[in-house]
Amino acid sequence: MGFSALVASALCTFLLPLLLFLAAVRLWDLYCASGRDPSCPLPLPPGTMGLPFFGETLQMVLQRRKFLQMKRRKYGFIYKTHLFGRPTVRVMGAENVRHILLGEHRLVSVQWPASVRTILGSGCLSNLHNGQHKHRKKVIMQAFSRDALQHYVPVIQEEVSACLAQWLGAGPCLLVYPEVKRLMFRIAMRILLGFQPRQASPDGEQQLVEAFEEMIRNLFSLPIDVPFSGLYRGLRARNIIHAKIEENIRAKMARKEPEGGYKDALQLLMEHTQGNGEQLNMQELKESATELLFGGHETTASAATSLIAFLGLHHDVLQKVRKELQLKGLLSGPNQEKQLNMEFLEQLKYTGCVIKETLRLSPPVPGGFRIALKTLELNGYQIPKGWNVIYSICDTHDVADLFTDKDEFNPDRFMSPSPEDSSRFSFIPFGGGLRSCVGKEFAKVLLKIFTVELARSCDWQLLNGPPTMKTGPIVYPVDNLPAKFIGFSGQI
């Protein structure tokens, strides 16, 4: 074979497929750009749409924060992309986010990716709209009133204290993140769904925790339900969770009065169904309960793990927490216990600022999803009707001019008379607007109790130093945060 024939063969083998691939990508970009609203004079935001059909989903899933930071550096505070099968505009910055969050029902409406809607189900709060969402949220909010939270305080304190005692006997290395997840799961099962202590065996509890991990790993995936796909695995894990929750619902139906002296969120939903004409069937109750468990333990586990990491790296901050506890009479000796209540917790201003600073630097949920109800004009660009909109929590915190020395862990920034979260949309760990997190007050109380018990019973060392954090979809440490825990003497 002559040289020219070899060159021609090589061109056909390598160059032609490459040209076809580049042409397909270009045609895909043009196809996506054809979704632009011609009646609006503004251009689409800058950005790329990735591969045909797949868009940039695979890049985002594999690289997460690195991918998002690269996009922000290249395109700024608003850019277009293609994620989870939909053309999408990602926005950040207080003003841009304010426009989205205050436009609920008028400019935008909630719409999670198809895989999330399929796995969590149409009956959960985050997938409801308008009046239906308003009424359901009002019912669930009863489970997070101040009186309800007061009932939860001793339950949370009991679980946290027992867990920390086990950590102190765990030896030279304990993987913090899996242990915190199990703790938060037990608390959520008791408080939100009304499971009683020891209702589930350790093996049964571990099976549920693993099922939740599998479901959440595959929550954001391509909407393809075939064996071994992410959506298939997520649905299979969800069905395990639903089976256990159905047992609990049927047990509740057989009882006349709630156990534990308070009504959990699931009990309130069931009573609302029976008394107000909103007929939730068993599937909808299971979906609502699954959503409560997801919101009630995954996000708090992420935040509590970040708290341990930041306090382990900043011993001066931990000492300030202990000094505040000492001033309030909450720093006891190793053999004494001080029962907490809402009044005590509300007095712990610095501890609250430590939690705020943790949520600023490491918000558990990176953002929220909306869909444009009509073509929007935002920051000199158009967002066409029907396109998805993602508002970024983590990026908004990162770029907020309000925060000085943004990368520094400094809880004192929130202690001043004009705290650095005074701008409403610069600090949004719980989202905002009509769709803000329904359980945010529960999360704050839980994290405060966890911080108090941790500070007055434990000292610890992070064995791998500062952790590398990853989003998947909740923020977590890649190495599971190995640490060594020892008892705190009670002396500052």
Curated annotation (Swiss-Prot):
Induction: By retinoic acid. Its EC number is 1.14.13.-. Keywords: Endoplasmic reticulum, Heme, Iron, Lipid metabolism, Membrane, Metal-binding, Microsome, Monooxygenase, Oxidoreductase. It is a peripheral membrane protein. The keyword tRNA processing does not apply. PANTHER family: CYTOCHROME P450 26 (PTHR24286), CYTOCHROME P450 26A1 (PTHR24286:SF101). A cytochrome P450 monooxygenase involved in the metabolism of retinoates (RAs), the active metabolites of vitamin A, and critical signaling molecules in animals. RAs exist as at least four different isomers: all-trans-RA (atRA), 9-cis-RA, 13-cis-RA, and 9,13-dicis-RA, where atRA is considered to be the biologically active isomer, although 9-cis-RA and 13-cis-RA also have activity. Belongs to the cytochrome P450 family. This is Cytochrome P450 26A1. It comes from Gallus gallus. The gene is CYP26A1.
